């Protein structure tokens, strides 16, 4: 039945079948040419998880005997590098008049970081990136999300590098003509989202999960490609079923009735005309009330005056450019899509450590004690605590001895430790960086210097992380500019510690050029804030504030104004109960000011009374 249904679909939709065949061919070709790297990813993951398999020099052959004892130095050194901080956005305006908009973008992105699960995404990528050499962000606009007053919101997820198949021969995502992603989805989800029944389809790529085949899952493959106009198109399928085909994926899409052309309202199943078939069409423009400047003659003044009126104009929707897939590299590597993997860098040392660890373990376990007895003398071989040996005379007793046989593991331990140190040196990790005792650093300053040296070795990884987040923030802004029809609430903190409630409204970015034509202003520089890592470490910020207080940076110690500035800073750093303490100090300051004013008024009155002429005659 399944074969018959597929055959009928091919007969009914020859053009759709032709397009499906074309994309499936491109996908299979790209996957075949990427196969070696996909296999390498599986081995890298096995190393990180502490596989006991012993690989040959070419990484393909596996020894028949497994390691008996694995010291997983790859796991240890990768976990030592984990940075839980998320780089926060920094937006700079190119034009002076856009500085306020740049601040609003920055606050909007900070809100999105807090609400979209960036901490969980970063925590996952901190392991995937060094293991595989890179990882991918996927940015989408989800109309099912939002608040009571808004429809839709950004959706940010991570795609494992094994689930991204690039165009063969191209190592820059932005320069690719097409790129594939593959995901495992339930059949029910596919039917609900795309309206296609895939209940009879099989899972084609179970290796993107754990390799086990599930009857409830299917593999959904998505091709993002550059269309003829330079935009981004999308073709998505599952086995022999086309799920989506959009020539201009990032343009506004509306669903209309195939029969009468009426716009579909929500998720209605049947049109008013009776048709149940819907199709997607591009919605290119929207009507927006805009200011219009005109020059008119004023008969009262006899001069021409500029008048501003409102008129409704058709404005093209803003459309993002570029793939919604953003690569975060570990360390740049020439002629490769992904960066250098830490696993590949120290694989030889891990193999040696596995072999030596197993050898030491075997030596220790096979060593033991042997009893030397005269010929013919028997002993009790029981588990009793006290055993009896019967000898004929003292001479026979003198022949009884115990020989302890224990292999020397000193050299093995020395070589194992050398390989461990080589691995650490390769990645630029010191004992101080790991939080271990470092005998080479004799003072706190020396230890901090040692940590800074290690941090310098890892600076490239931080630069690549910041670059990926900068690009992600730029794409997030562009998606909001394109699809956020309702103003999105933005919460931020003012300099005095109070909360500021505003909105991100995309229409604020609609400008008119010198020719009178409307355009969307997206000319901003997106970076990451270099101080965000320190700001995440609240305890360090608290300690810094304490040091500044003692040094007199806030003012004279003991003065209420000094205390107010100090606790204002601690409140910004989220110090517990800092806000309550600050309010108490504010009350004391107010009381102090009232007392000073009262004392000043009293002094003025006394001065006024003392300066009046004496009306009484002298006695």
Language-model-derived ranges and their functions:
Residues 84-91, 116, 325, 332, ...:
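Generic signal for short, ordered secondary-structure residues
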Residues 80, 100-101, 324, 394-396, ...:
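Short, flexible segments with low predicted structural confidence
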Residues 345:
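Core catalytic machinery and nucleic-acid-binding channels of phosphodiester-processing enzymes
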Residues 1-40, 45-58, 129, 137, ...:
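C-terminal anchoring/interaction modules
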Residues 329-334, 340, 353:
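Protruding loop/beta-arch "assembly-hinge" segments enriched in small, turn-prone residues
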Residues 1-301, 310, 415-418, 510, ...:
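Extended, helix-rich architectural segments
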């Amino acid at each position: 039945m399944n074969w018959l249904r597929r055959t009928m679909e091919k007969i009914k939709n020859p053009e759709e079948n032709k397009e499906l065949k074309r994309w499936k061919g491109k996908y299979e070709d790209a996957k075949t040419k990427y196969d070696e790297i996909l296999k390498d990813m599986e081995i890298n993951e096995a190393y990180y998880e502490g596989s006991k398999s012993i690989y040959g020099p070419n990484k393909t052959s596996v020894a028949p005997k497994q390691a008996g004892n694995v010291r997983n130095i790859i796991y240890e050194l990768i976990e030592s590098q984990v940075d839980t901080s998320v780089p926060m956005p920094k937006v700079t305006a190119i034009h002076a008049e856009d500085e306020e908009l740049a601040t609003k973008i920055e606050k909007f992105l900070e809100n999105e970081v807090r609400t979209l699960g960036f901490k969980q995404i970063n925590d996952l990528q901190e392991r995937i990136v060094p293991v595989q050499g890179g990882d991918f962000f996927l940015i989408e606009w989800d109309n099912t999300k939002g608040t009571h007053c808004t429809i839709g919101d950004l959706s940010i997820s991570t795609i494992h590098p094994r689930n991204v198949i690039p165009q063969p021969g191209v190592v820059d995502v932005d320069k690719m003509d097409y790129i594939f992603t593959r995901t495992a989805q339930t059949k029910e989800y596919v039917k609900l989202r795309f309206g296609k029944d895939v209940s009879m389809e099989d899972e084609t790529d179970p290796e993107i999960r754990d390799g086990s085949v599930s009857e409830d899952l299917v593999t959904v493959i998505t091709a993002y490609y550059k269309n003829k106009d330079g935009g981004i198109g999308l073709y998505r399928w599952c086995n022999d079923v086309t799920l989506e085909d959009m020539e201009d994926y990032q343009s506004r899409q509306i669903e209309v009735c195939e029969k009468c052309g009426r716009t579909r309202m929500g998720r209605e199943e049947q049109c008013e005309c009776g048709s149940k078939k819907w199709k997607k069409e591009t919605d290119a423009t929207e009507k927006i009330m805009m200011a219009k400047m005109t020059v008119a003659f004023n008969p009262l003044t006899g001069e021409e005056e500029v008048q501003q009126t409102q008129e409704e104009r058709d404005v093209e929707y803003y459309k993002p450019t570029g793939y919604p897939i953003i690569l975060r590299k570990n360390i740049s590597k020439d002629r490769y899509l992904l960066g250098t993997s830490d696993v590949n860098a120290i694989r030889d040392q891990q193999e040696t450590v596995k072999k030596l660890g197993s050898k030491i373990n075997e030596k220790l376990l096979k060593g033991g004690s042997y009893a030397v007895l005269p010929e013919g003398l028997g002993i009790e071989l029981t588990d009793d605590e006290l055993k009896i040996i019967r000898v004929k005379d003292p001479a026979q007793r003198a022949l009884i001895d115990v020989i302890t046989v224990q292999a020397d593991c000193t050299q093995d331990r020395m070589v194992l430790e050398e390989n461990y140190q080589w691995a650490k040196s390769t990645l630029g990790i010191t004992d101080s960086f790991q939080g271990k005792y470092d005998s080479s650093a004799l003072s706190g300053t020396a230890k901090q210097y040692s940590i800074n040296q290690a941090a310098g070795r890892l600076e490239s990884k931080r630069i690549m992380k910041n670059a990926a987040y900068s690009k992600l923030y730029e794409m997030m802004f562009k998606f909001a500019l394109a699809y956020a029809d309702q103003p999105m609430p933005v919460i931020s903190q003012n300099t005095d510690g109070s909360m500021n409630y505003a909105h991100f409204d995309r229409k604020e970015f609609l400008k008119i050029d010198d020719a009178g034509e409307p355009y969307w202003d997206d000319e901003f520089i997106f970076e990451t804030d270099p101080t965000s890592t320190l700001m995440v470490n609240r305890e360090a910020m608290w300690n810094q504030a304490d040091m500044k207080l003692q040094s007199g940076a806030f003012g004279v110690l003991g003065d209420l104004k000094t205390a107010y500035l100090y606790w204002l800073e601690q409140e910004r750093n989220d110090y517990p109960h800092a806000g309550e303490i600050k309010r108490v100090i504010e009350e004391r300051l107010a009381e102090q000011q009232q007392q000073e004013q009262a004392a000043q008024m009293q002094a003025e009155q006394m001065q006024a009374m003392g300066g009046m002429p004496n009306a009484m005659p002298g006695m």
